[in-house]
Amino acid sequence: MHTGKISEIAYKRSVLKKICDKSDNLQVGIDGAHMAIEDVTMVISSNCILKWFLGCERYYLQKTLNDIYASGGSPKYVQLQINIPDDFEEKQLGRIIRSFDEAVTEMGLSIQKCDVYAGNVSQVLIQIHVIGVSEKTFSLKDIKENTDIVMAGTIAIGATSIITSLYESKLRERFHDTFVDGCLKISEFTNIKKITDVAKEQNILYMHHVSDGGVFAAAWEMASAVNLGIEVDIKKIPVWQETIEIAEVFDYNPYMTDGTGAVLI
């Protein structure tokens, strides 16, 4: 399998079909699982670090928080589960934890639980869990035929941010420093909270965070979840010039790669 979230077809075939008691939270296109506890509805989401680069702790934390925002929630609780190789240096572990703590603190939260295990793994494995309180719940069942879907944000912000971080020196050989510096700052646009805060005040039916697989995958997931087709006007999908330039250098389709920072509404 390719690196990243598995395909919608593989998820249905090898995950959903193997689970007997199917919760509504297990559907394709669900960003966060809702759980009602008396008069409070909690929303839960998780993510794992798939690529290591400068600032990856902050980036993957933001992806997880975005799932909570898109689910109509407000994050309250952050938990980390970390698996490290037996010979992993304690100083390296400390740097990772410090990076997470700085990112969490900057976002107005705190790490409430952190488990670290040393074992037979070849690299560090980190799972990020976030629990929030749902301020407004949405249901895929409300999506009917002829429903309009709009995208807030711009495509492939996540991919542009990651690739620039990984290949900064190579890009500086090809582009002016000002351009590369701008691409590095694109990570500042991965937070969708302002978008979802505005959307929640409107009469919307559903929100879906564009993430792994890009805007095409996100649109397909929404359509597949409600068993409907979808028509996309590609000319109306916002894309920045920085994204186009980076995609051309590394020969990938910006419509089909990490779109963290955009939301389908």
Feature annotation, model-predicted:
Residues M1-L264:
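Helix-biased detector of long, well-ordered alpha-helical tracts
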